[in-house]
Amino acid sequence: MREYRALQTLAATARFSRAPRFFDFGDDESGNPSSKASKVMPDDDQSLSEQRAQGATLLHAPPQPLTLRINGAEHNLTIEPRVTLLDALREVLGLTGTKKGCDRGQCGACTVLVDGQRINACLTLAMMHDGREITTVEGLGEQGQPHPMQQAFMDCDGFQCGYCTPGQVCSAVALLDEVKARQASMLTEGDQLAPGALSEDEIRERMSGNLCRCGAYPNIVKAIHSVVLRQA
């Protein structure tokens, strides 16, 4: 984790190293730029070059050992610190149920559960989840025994092309836990969700981070609502 934070800091330094060396702090009594400004940035180009070189070195840091707990199984890996959780799942472990859509955290196709909380796997580094419990769509059910949410998506035709479905299902499973915990959303009146108050608008709000280009939203909402009613 320390290496990751150092990587962020030095990468940012390298990226913005062409910023003006002085900021406008006003003139001193002699009419020259204030001496305060000279302390803001390094005094010579050599120090900037050294910072760039150090940042580049960390961007190509050697592979590090890592243990990921995925769907109840431990995986001991050795990967570069810059590898995202999404790429570790798909490219290293072959768990291709988690989809790469926008790769920018906007579509939700890569949604997985980490310690029960839904996250976008494309926006987080694998190194940040050492030892944590990760659940992908492959871990929700078994062949012939799908998770109730998976079954509901099939029964309600909650998909068309199916590319976004793994992320939709993982997000919907997390939604069930949120409802049980009575967690509020942006639409909830009050600090807690009242029993039986999960409306279609609430479902749409809670699923707004998962996009479907095919437009299967009505059936997705129907599928989620059916599971909530059965578990009530």
Residue ranges and their predicted role:
Residues 1, 13, 40-41:
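Short hydrophobic transmembrane-like helices used for membrane targeting/insertion
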Residues 2-5, 19, 26, 30-33:
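Short, low-complexity intrinsically disordered segments enriched in A/P/G/S/L with frequent Arg
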Residues 7-10, 48:
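Leucine-biased recognition of intrinsically disordered, low-complexity hydrophobic segments
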Residues 12, 30-33, 225:
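Amphipathic alpha-helical interaction segments
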Residues 22-23, 36-232:
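Signature of N-terminal electron-transfer/Fe-S-associated modules in redox systems
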